[in-house]
């Protein structure tokens, strides 16, 4: 990977995607955001990101279908799922079995934990706790 790492964030909550964009941009990432599954797929095709952040509940295509398509078309690209849907771990287990790199519940308790997971996905060391 050369230059700035690139992320695509796909979530139907504009405020959430803008917060993700701002957080990662200030840390040297290039971030592209999409509010629907189909537009997210187009961004992945156009930008070939280093990692994808995706919600499960999306207009046009749910996160499960999106994850499965990404695994077929971009098997080396880590996909991190961030969702408000929490069922005691069943969803997490299913997503990991489908090939997700990691799973986070909304609301996120720490953007730093997400950043550390993205760095792990990209093969970089995580930030040191202060």
Residue map of PLM features:
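Conserved acidic segment of CheY-like receiver
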Residues: 4-15, 20-24
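Short hydrophobic/Thr-rich beta-strand motif most characteristic of the beta2 strand and flanking loop
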Residues: 28-35, 43
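Hydrophobic/aromatic residues positioned on beta-strands within the core alpha/beta folds
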Residues: 82-83
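Active-site beta3 strand of CheY-like receiver
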Residues: 47-53, 58
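Acidic catalytic/metal-coordinating carboxylates
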Residues: 36-39, 62-65
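Alpha4 helix (beta4-alpha4-beta5 surface) of REC/receiver domains from two-component response regulators
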Residues: 65, 86-116
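Residue-level signal for the "D+5" position in two-component response regulator receiver
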Residues: 33, 58-61
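The feature encodes the CheY-like receiver
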Residues: 17, 59, 87
């Amino acid at each position: 990977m050369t230059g700035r790492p690139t992320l695509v964030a796909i979530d139907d909550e504009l405020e959430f995607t803008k917060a993700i964009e701002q957080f990662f941009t200030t840390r040297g990432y290039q971030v592209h955001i999409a509010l629907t599954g189909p537009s997210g797929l187009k961004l992945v095709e156009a930008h070939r990101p280093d990692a994808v952040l995706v919600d499960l509940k999306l207009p046009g295509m749910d996160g499960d279908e999106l994850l499965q398509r990404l695994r077929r078309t971009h098997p080396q690209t880590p996909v991190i799922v961030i969702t408000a849907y929490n069922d005691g771990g069943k969803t997490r287990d299913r997503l990991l079995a489908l090939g997700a790199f990691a799973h986070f519940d909304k609301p996120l308790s720490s953007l730093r934990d997400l950043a550390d997971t993205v760095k792990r996905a990209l093969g970089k060391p995580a930030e040191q706790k202060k």
